[in-house]
Amino acid sequence: VTLRLAISGFGRIGRMTLRAFQEMRHQDMEIVLINSPGPVETSAHLYEFDSVHGRAVGTVTHGDDWMDVGSGKIHMSRERDPANIPHAAHGVDIVLECSGKFNSREASAAHLAAGAKKVLVSAPCKNADQTIVFGVNDSLLTADADVVSNASCTTNCLAPVAKVLADSVGIEAGYMTTIHAYTGDQPTLDSSHKDLRRARAAAMSMIPTSTGATKSVGEVLPQLQGKMSGSAIRVPTANVSVVDLVVTTSRDTSLEEINQLLTAAANGPMKGVLGINERPLVSIDFNHDPHSSVADLTQTSVLNKRLVRVLAWYDNEWGFSCRMLDNAVAIGKFL
């Protein structure tokens, strides 16, 4: 049975999720509906031409209420209220809620009222039935979870590495810094924002700010609840971020062991989600990398046998968008 998906919100993640669907050639799903309040012409143009990921594969055509990116016509709706999106009329199984505006169970459940069977939210979601990081806790997904959170791009990078360490050498405490590319909520020139640092010009400063990733990693890996803290520094690059994780371990370990553990996970149970790098690369080299997390083995450090540092790269747009589709398939198995 082919899963029928809708994308609601056609910004960075919505567009990249559609591109990932096209590039990965998912045979077990089809995108039947996209909801975006803006003009269809704008959606089609921004899908086809992207400053970060280049031009889309294939030919893009559109009409008044449809767009075709190479897999047949997709109906385009322009509703601002999710309750009015024609999910029922298009037989939508799962909505990928990518607008960034309905990040609570109550708000995103409007999609269910409109006829969708399940909702997958592309962000941390307050009171979600479950938060699932694919490759880390997707085995815990249940049939009765109607609103599922895909967590954040940073949680998707942190959680695989944290799980590998927690399951082997143990984590007593950990601190994560994400050195993060600027995102669409930051201005090009100083502007008002409730976070006075995020109010500043994105491409001109390193900007210390908060991250919810360490809190939500405790939801995904309950054994780490209360053991992790973290912060973010937004830097003047357009895409690709890096998690710098430092933990104290429960037992003695070595640099060699840590790298062996990460390599074994990347080649085994976390293949496709966790990657490894052993070459002298920089952030742009990970643009369009489909992994959630790429551990850079050249940067691993172990001090006094118990203070461990791991660096993990992630394309904060593309990797996360690929996981939206993986989680949709996982949720679809219950339909």
What are these regions (language model features)?
Residues 1-199, 302, 324-326, 334:
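N-terminal Rossmann-like NAD(P) cofactor-binding subdomain of oxidoreductases
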Residues 76-81, 226-227, 292:
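Short gly/ser/thr-rich secondary-structure transition/capping motifs
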Residues 18, 109, 159-166, 177, ...:
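Predominant activation on well-ordered alpha-helical scaffold segments within soluble catalytic domains
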Residues 10, 14, 104, 151-154, ...:
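Generic structural signal for well-ordered, non-membrane alpha-helical segments
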Residues 67, 132-134, 147, 189, ...:
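Short clusters of hydrophobic/aromatic residues that line enzyme substrate/ligand-binding pockets
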Residues 167, 171-238:
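Acidic, glycine-rich segments within the central catalytic cores of soluble metabolic enzymes
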Residues 37-40, 125-126, 152-154, 178-185, ...:
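Glycine-rich beta-alpha junction loops
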Residues 2-3, 230, 242, 246-335:
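C-terminal active-site/capping subdomain that shapes the small-molecule cofactor and substrate pocket
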